[in-house]
Amino acid sequence: MAVSLASLFLLVCGVQSSHADSTHPRVSLETNLGTIVIELYPDKAPATVKNFLAYVDAGFFAGTIFHRVIKGFMIQGGGFGEDMQPKPTQKPILNEANNGLLNLRGTIAMARTSQPHSATSQFFINTKDNQFLNHKDKTSQGWGYCVFGKVVEGMDVVDAIESQKTTSRAGYQDVPDHPVTIVKAEQITLSPQEVH
């Protein structure tokens, strides 16, 4: 009987761990190549998640493209329209890369300039483990790039975007030949069955 109860306990725990955590909001990025669902970690990167959700809720990402795609590295978007003109953004946020999250395949992180605290709306999804992007120390060279979530559905779409042929356009390199556009970005409400 003890073995049966222990087995049942493990089974129940396993089922619960496969469901979404209600404290982790999810965002759907509908692109012209398919939909990517991202789970966010406000407990690890509160300012970054708040910033990202503000852009999502404002409809900012609709019509933006993945403007930088590098095979075996990452796909980057969230700042340019199909005309390769940057969209006006809110002020930069503090870099929360020292949160313990790593730039592993399928994670989403904030893009920025060489200044550590310069991220606004642009983000990237890692298509491989990119350890060199992780936080090392609080210097300009060591700050790293803040991971604030991960892809939970649609990694095949990320891979399809990564496989696009690229070119140089409007002074930018690694731009997909055919625009990969975010049609819509929105928060997803989880059903009671999905939340435990």
Q: Which residues does each predicted region cover?
A:
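Cyclophilin-like peptidyl-prolyl cis-trans isomerases
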Residues: 9-196
